[in-house]
Amino acid sequence: MKTNPTAYAPETDALDYWESLEGMFTVVKKPHVLGPQYKGDIYVLGEDFTGLPLNNIGGLNLRPHAQNTATIPIYVGNQFVAKAKDYFAEDVTGVVTYRNSFYKVEPTQQLTVQDGGLQRQAAQTQPSEDKLTIASYNIENFSANNDKNETPEDKVTLIANSFIHEIHNPDIITLIEVQDNNGSVDDGTTSGLESGRKLANRIKELGGKSYEYTEVAPVDGADGGKPGSNIRLGILYNPERVSLAKKEAATSNEAAQFDKGHLVKNPARIAPNDPSFDHTRKSLAVEFEFKGQPVVVIANHLKSKIGDDAIYGASQPAVEHTLPTREAQASVIHQFVQEGLKQNPKTTFVLTGDFNDYDFSTTAQILAGSELTNLMSQHDAGDRYSYFYRGSNQVLDNIFISNNMAAKARFEPVHINASFMKEHGRASDHDPVLVQIDFSGAQTSGTPTDDQQGNIGQATEQTSPSSSNTGTQLVPHQAQANEQKSSTSESKEKDKDEDEKQEDKEEAATETKTPGKRKILPSTGQETSYLALFGVAVVTMSLIWYKKKRTTY
């Protein structure tokens, strides 16, 4: 992203740096893969990358106010199978091109990737009698329709098995992207009870617990997502472990309310008629009782990022058009939690879901306020991700909990999807996240101390290094190939990236931009630090090439 669109500065600006390499042969030194192949692209770092600290799987976590522009996209085609930590034993040579609002390297050689050994993991958190376990999982357009283009049976089995063997039968499961019973068949169907029950039945068939399912169906066509599918939030719960507060369920347009600290109707959607929730999913509030204690679980799926400017697109500086809507939604949800805690300070609130925003975002800050703790932001920084997009591990799935129970909570993302492809067992584009809350003692009050928060996870931040730590990894080949510019680059001024995956798939058809304050996207990455060294390195390599040109060619 350019902060000054009128100045050309390849030494300090990511967009200009890539533009300076377009059409040139380049070499990426023995790269390692950062995430799964998606729509023909993989993202890599060269072996000579010495910039930002890597996370626990050798990737780069997205950071505040920056994009990881040091990552290099390589076009490998849709049949190429690769996952995080895989690597290439040889250098990759190719031509820098531009398509779909992004620069990438198109190899001039046959590529063979080596297995880096990364495995899907199971949660360390185990069931316990006095501890309540809540999981959150975006199950990516799930319905009872098993047609080829809907939810095939093998996906149902994969997700069901993950709840049994990898998440260990949590007591409550919040489900994101549950579709209506027939999926994208647009016939006016809104109920998703068959979809939720199909998953519950498959879990039981495979040896898991017996779950019940609850939801509030949306108004037909009003909540965004894939046309005709009516995605919504749903909740599975184990009635042998928790009891659903016995109340009449709210209708689609009835707003959740508290009376003496308890939901008037259960389940109910939060402010379904608020303008900030137009054409997007409404948050679902459900009240349970565990060991005699009230627990209100709020499942969320906030507005997607479709509509934001691409960081290398024609509009510069790039603007995050969708952020004001998520901030407004967060404010509505936070006010709801405040009212519940005001009426009954001993209620445990747990907010889960796909917030379509990061753990460090203003959206997360508004949601937390002074009443809640974001457990993801307290977790080990090297393990702090649930999603992979455009070269960065990042957080879209957070869990917030009442401050009075934060010190009694154990949080864990379960990395079974985001770093992998379907060939490795991936069932969704999101990793599930879970929290286990210890109810064995009396509830405490107030905000947890620093020592108490330390029990949640290591809060070690991945701070930005000085610019002197960064080495180059993408250098021009000795022979320029401007004449080999890809014909696909001709669309650079008008292409909109069709695979912007910070979304609930084809939501663009139904979501509308919300006017409001404009927020600048995080900068494209250390423009004044490691990108400056990229430029210096390129200049240095160019000088070396020039001196050797007569003897080399």
Residue spans for each PLM region:
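Intrinsically disordered, low-complexity repeat and linker tracts
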Residues: 442-532, 552-553
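Metal-dependent phosphoester-hydrolase catalytic domains
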Residues: 28, 83-118, 238-280, 337-349, ...
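Structured beta-strand-rich core segments of catalytic domains in phosphoester-bond hydrolases
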Residues: 192-303
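Solvent-exposed loop/turn segments at secondary-structure junctions
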Residues: 33-34, 139-144, 178-182, 218-223, ...
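Extended non-catalytic accessory segments flanking core domains
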Residues: 1-133, 137, 141-145, 150-169, ...
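C-terminal membrane-anchoring or membrane-association module
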Residues: 538-553
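His/acidic metal-ligating clusters that form di-metal
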Residues: 285, 289, 296, 322-351
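N-terminal, active-site-proximal structural segment of metallo-dependent hydrolase catalytic domains
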Residues: 102-233, 308-319, 325-334, 346, ...
